[in-house]
């Protein structure tokens, strides 16, 4: 195993636009903090923008399949991976990781970002003293990531399979509670 800074495993780390777009009833999805759940995107509560707003919000980077989104605050350090065939842009307080697939499997990185090892680093990086926790980009870039050099794909598949079972259990519990 080796240890790398997050910035060394990404081709880019992009902060989202710091503005609230004008919402539409339909159109292109906007990922917001509350859409990030257990490494996945949950669009139970959906927000949309029109094409013009979308094009404005993706000027820094276009979110693509297997990019990872991290919340910078409220709550801080929650992550999700972008699935295939999702056209979206980011809302406020989010960061887009363009994962270098030649260096790390994006699914492996997603689960490492969810680990206690990394989440503890996120909490330690928040030294603002503010009531609202905040993860700033320079601190995020320097987060240390443990990288196994062999079997990343196998580990990623196993963790994704376990996560799928957990999500299924949540759905079953929701149906039983209804």
What are these regions (language model features)?
Residues 1-41, 53-58:
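Low-complexity, Lys/Gly-biased intrinsically disordered segments
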Residues 107-139:
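Short, positively charged
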Residues 88-95, 127-156, 160:
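A short glycine-rich beta-alpha junction/loop motif
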Residues 46-49:
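Short glycine-enriched, charge-decorated loop/helix-capping segments at active-site entrances
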Residues 32, 51-114, 136:
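A short beta-sheet element
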